Design a protein with these regions (language model features):
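HIT superfamily nucleotide-processing domains
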Residues: 1-149
């Protein structure tokens, strides 16, 4: 079970409140019913993240069955292609891609999707290792490990 502090948007986001909590198909997902994709293929829809941790944070959402590994593979492939194109065009220095699977891992929308986060050199200094997905987010102010209280 998640707390309000962990996912404050869940309790206040009308799109999430009005959506099916565990959709069985893409057409029942919160994204399909409340937003238009930035682009899409026959297997993947790409949306801007409603709560971005960095400018350009996108979600790559499988349109295939949520139990079909080909769908999530396609989402990762599309995110990777876009990231490499952004690097080639000089729009970003690097990027993170990843998933949260299950509430204990931070998932708040229960349909498979890949987070894509563009990164710039030095975009988050002073929080441990200078690279990696953890540095895309500001430190948790409630964490006992946070040295910036």
């Amino acid at each position: 079970m998640t707390s309000e502090r962990e996912f404050p948007w869940v309790d206040n986001d009308q799109d999430l409140i009005n959506s099916k909590p565990n959709p069985e198909k893409y057409e029942e997902s919160v994204w399909f019913n409340n937003d238009k994709p930035v682009r899409e293929t026959d297997k993947v829809a790409v949306y801007n993240d409603k709560y971005p941790c960095k400018q350009g944070h996108r979600l790559y959402i499988t349109k295939l069955s949520k139990d079909n590994p080909e769908g999530i593979g396609s989402a990762f492939q599309e995110a990777f292609k876009d990231g490499m194109e952004m690097i080639a065009q000089g729009k970003t220095d690097g990027f993170n891609m990843g998933m949260n699977i299950g509430a204990s891992a931070g998932q708040s929308v229960f349909w498979p999707h890949v987070h894509f986060i563009p990164r710039q050199t030095g975009d988050q200094k002073g929080y441990g290792h200078p690279r990696g997905v953890r540095q895309a987010f500001p430190p948790d102010p409630y964490s006992p490990n946070n040295k910036e209280k």
